[in-house]
Amino acid sequence: MSENYSDSDSSCGWTVINHEGSDIETVTSENGSSNDNHEFVSEEYVSLQEVEQPIELQAQDSTDGEIPVVDNTLSALEETQTVPEERKEKVHDDSSCIGTISDDSDIVTLEAPKGEETPSQEEAPADGEEAPSSEDFNMGSSSSSQYAFSQPETVFPSQASDDESSSDETSNQSSPTVRRRRAKRRLISCSEAESGSPVGPEPEPPQEQQHKRQFSSGLNRCIILALVIAISMGFGHFYGTIQIQKRQQLLTKTRELKDDLYQCQQEQGDKVGSLKGDLATCLTSTEVEKKSFESQKKSLAAENQHLRESLEKEEKALVSLQEELRKLRQQIRNLEDKGTSTESIVMENQKLREHLEEEKQRNHNFRRQKETLFAEAQMLRRELDKERHVTEALKKELEQLSSRQTPDSVNDDDTLRENEEIETLRGRLVELEKKLNFEQQRSDLWEKLYVEAKDLTEKQEMNEKGQKRGAKGQSKSKKKSKESFFGSVKETFDVMKNSAKEFVRHHKEKIKQAKEAVKEKLKKFSDSVKSTFRHFKDTTKTILDEKEKKPNEKKYEANKKARTFYREHNLYENLKQSHYRRPNVPKDFRDGRRHHFTAFEKDTDSQKCLNDPLCSRKHQFDLKGCSGIFECANQEFVSLFNRVSDPIGVDEFNRLMRKYLQQVVHNFRHWRELENFINKFFHNGFFIHDQMLFTDFVNDVKDYLEDMKEYQNKNEKVFDDLDKYIYRYYFQYDNSPQYGPSRPKRPSFTQTENPRHEKQAQKYHHRNKREGKWHKHGRTNGRHMANLEIELGQLPFDPKY
């Protein structure tokens, strides 16, 4: 920052200290006689240095902080510091040594000596080189008068570079350090001409020396005055620079504060925006919550109103109940006052309830018996229809047989005999039809009587219920009166008791009459049917035997064709309908009957089904009068075993069969075959009670086991108690149900009348053994010949008979 200038043109002994902010110039005269002036100058110099030291420290502190300077201050400082070159040239041209002080800067300009004393510029550097070489520096010697330039002391540190000064000059921006540019002028001493003179000058006169001394003393005084002025101005300048630095520091601080404030404002703006968004969301949420709260408030208010209304209603009901309770207590007190106890009333009520339960049970039993009677009547009617169809079929068969006979194929005697037999058969058939019609009329009459009796019983029940209600109303009205309370209770009890007794007695008589009438009718009907069909069976048997003995080849071939066709038809139907069972006929009678009617059934039924396509539909009867598995099972078990039970399940029946066979037979090896056979009679896990009786199914299972060869050879009666075992398990019933008073034993095949019947029975025994009892609509199993003999024994609706 500081610069040292030494000019060879100046011959006076000057010491110029160029400092920023002030220029301290010391001028020594040539004569050097005045030591006081020298000491004064040195003291001033030392004091100036002491003053400048703290200023330098402050400048160093300010430069360490790198304070920016405003462009306006720099431009002002440069204007004050720069000195135009024209002044410098004027200084060189001036010949006077009068000191001048410029207003622009604190620079002292001294007037130069005369022009002839001014040395040339070439000699000045030589003299300048000699000056530092002299050890004894004498300010008063005129011969050695010269400028001596000392190194100026810098107030600011040397950290600032020339690049910064050049950049500050060219740019308007603030620089980190304050720089002052001082104008360097050549100070021309008065003794330039003398210093430029040769080494050995001529001695001057004393007047000139005195004049020079006076001039040098005045010059020293001017220099001292200029120094004092410069020091004062420098001190003021230093003080001004410090204030400028402080202002610059304040400016930097204010700028930093402005930046911080701007950043804070931006951050606060962002925060305010986020807070505004949060407030908006909070407002919307609060509005939603407010609406929900209002809706909840309304709902709660409505619910509260509803609860209040319900509470008021309950309070009213409670008040009414309390009033009623008070009245009842008052009545109890009144009754206790009369001397009666509540225990007797409770006992009477209990007895009345028990009696009512008994009457209800009796009524229920009576209704069940009535239903069973009605079902039996329907069964009888269906049996009659069945027998009528059978007689019609027999009539058709006889007509066909009579039409087939030709006079050419037989002898006259045979034809006459056959015609007579046919006529007799026709007559008997006519008689049988008449009897059947008569029995039909009787059954219709009995059914009408039964319906009338049923209507009468229903009317009586309605009347008795009305009487009971009237008695109850009378008892209630009498209970209200305090005096006749117990009398009314007794009267109602007696009325109910008497009415129940009369009702039971009347219905018992009706039931007895109905049972006796049914018994008589069934006996008469069974006797008449048995006699007619037994006689008809014998006659047909003799006719068939005689026909087979005749040597008629055509007739034999026709019968053979009919047999083969019937056999094929039966095999196909048995394969197709293997899970349907045979009719409900006792097994022994069925086997015995098969020996007598096998051939006749084959001949007649095959021809009948050929001529009549609706033959299968004529024999599809629902003999039970029930619908559904549960209803049929209940009806069957109640009628046969007098027990109510659910339908039989396949899993339970299989477990029962396994248990029985493990007890009876060791190592039974036909489990799978037996299960397949049993599963044919079960649908969806239950027995088909609506298609077949369970007792027939048990008999069929028993027959299936008895027909196994390995158990047939050893002992025929291995599975004889199977039915009892099953009935005991399901119904706690030891005896198997009987369908007639006498169940004929199974006749052996050796007891047949002739070997032909034995062969036919053996031939068709296995095929017709497992034909179903009940048939679905639209199905047939090949057995078109119904059982012609009806055996009636125990009535199924009451186990007493």
From Swiss-Prot:
Q: Where is the composition biased (Acidic residues)?
A: 124-133
The membrane spanning regions, by residue number, are 222-242
Region of interest called Disordered, as start-end residue ranges on this chain: 79-214, 397-417, 460-483, 736-780
Cell compartment(s), UniProt: Cytoplasmic granule membrane
Task: Spell out the InterPro entries in the cross-references.
Answer: CCPG1/PBIP1
Q: Where is the composition biased (Basic residues)?
A: 178-187, 468-481, 762-780
Cytoplasmic-side stretches of the chain, per the record, are: 1-221
The membrane topology of this protein is: Single-pass type II membrane protein
Keyword Plastid on this protein? Answer: no
Mind listing the UniProt keywords for this protein, alphabetically? Cell cycle, Coiled coil, Membrane, Signal-anchor, Transmembrane, Transmembrane helix
Q: Which residues lie on this side of the membrane: Lumenal?
A: 243-801
Keyword Coiled coil, does the record have it?
yes
Give start-end ranges for the coiled-coil region(s).
285-449, 500-530, 695-726
Where is this chain compositionally biased, Low complexity type? 168-177
Q: For this UniProt entry, what is the primary localization, expressed as one broad class?
A: membrane
Any one GO BP annotation for this protein: positive regulation of cell population proliferation
In the record, the note on similarity to other proteins reads: Belongs to the CCPG1 family.
Q: What does this protein do?
A: May be involved in the regulation of Rho-mediated signaling pathways and in cell cycle regulation.
Q: What is this protein called?
A: Cell cycle progression protein 1
Report which gene this protein is encoded by.
CCPG1
